[in-house]
Amino acid sequence: MLVVTTNDLPGHRVQEVLGEVFGLTVRSRHLGSQIGAGLKSLVGGELRGLTKTLVETRNQAMERLVEQARARGANAVLSFRFDVTEAADVGTEVCAYGTAVVVARE
């Protein structure tokens, strides 16, 4: 599955546009991570626990996007984006989205 942020795929021709696909996940915050992050924010620096959680969350959202695109018969996703939102002060929502297409080499 080719997943790109561009609106086209060099060297390929779009044969069919299958529509929007997305992968969504919401992760709750771990109390220990929140306390550690609060203390770390006082002195500065990377919040490694939160960074790890966000990377895992983004990867899961992307995996779900790819699953949905495959289920619709796509072999590529164009205009791929992430949207990250705080969900009611209890977690983080990550949505990966794009346009599912069938492409062929030119």
From Swiss-Prot:
What InterPro entries does the annotation carry?
UPF0145_dom_sf, UPF0145_YbjQ-like
Matching Gene3D superfamilies, A to Z? Hypothetical protein apc22750. Chain B (3.30.110.70)
Q: Which domain of life is it from?
A: Bacteria
Any Pfam family from its record, for instance, is YbjQ_1
Q: What family is reported?
A: Belongs to the UPF0145 family.
What this protein is called in its record is: UPF0145 protein SCO3412
